[in-house]
Amino acid sequence: MKKKFTFIDLFAGIGGIRIPFDELGGNCVFTSEFDKFAQQTYEANFGETPSGDITLINEKDIPKHDILLGGFPCQAFSNAGLRKGFNDTRGTLFFDIARILDYHKPKAFLLENVKGLRGHDQGRTFKTIISVINEIGYQTIESEVLNARDFGLPQNRERIFIVGFWKHKNFQFPIPPKTPTRLGSILQKRVQDRYTISDKLWASTQLRKKRAQQKGYGFGFSLFNRESKYTSTMSARYYKDGSEILIEQKDKNPRMLTPLEARRLQGFPDGFKIPVSNTQAYKQFGNAVPVSVIRAISKRIVKHL
């Protein structure tokens, strides 16, 4: 039997963190997302438009909830002193997570960020986050870097996840199943020519790579095919030229991923609607979380509620 629980979805993007918690029977009681195009995609798939700027929303106006979810941006805490207290985080979006945790004290939370958060600002940013959550009163705080490619998605995408519980719990992150992956599993059989990159773009991409190699630093266009185990990380700038993940084609220039393939690469279900332009779709999937990783974590969190 599914457990009944409530949750809120902050910095929701297009709802990648929400999907597995919905699947487990959770009831989402509040959502916030600033970007108007992400709001459109969210509304098309979940039937509700997220509230806008979280910095303008009073924590008292957010309903009570069991779990807080949030994939927040990585920002330095400019004044973080030795004490690394709550007020040092003012002016950053983490402060908004902290004030909501402090007011509502949900049973659990899940935060997601780039892998670099741990070393950001010589480790001060991460230390401050943990210190503030401790100050609020959370007894269990665990963090782990997990890779989408170890959870059945053919993409090398590392992210840090922070899970906390108000009470002491013996929480452990899921052990990555490391199921073998193959890029062909998410590629479409037939793709329109519009996704093939132009001669000019292909020539300039190869030239940039050659120059970068001569100077001794990495620049990637990265070329993949159906047999590739996984791609490099898809970023929000993929829409610009697609050079970070190019797919080989016989007797043609390489091509970009299609929005449908970008969706699959992040583990979103095939029924997930894309009501926005291709440019926005690439940005949204590039910013999204790998759903299969969240699915594995969500089961562990709900079990401990």
Where are these regions (language model features)?
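Class I S-adenosyl-L-methionine
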Residues: 57-67, 75-239
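Conserved SAM-binding strand-loop segment of SAM-dependent methyltransferases
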Residues: 47-54
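C-terminal target-recognition/interaction regions appended to catalytic cores
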Residues: 200-305
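Conserved SAM-binding loop
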Residues: 42
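Class I SAM-dependent methyltransferase "Motif I" SAM/SAH-binding loop
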Residues: 11-14
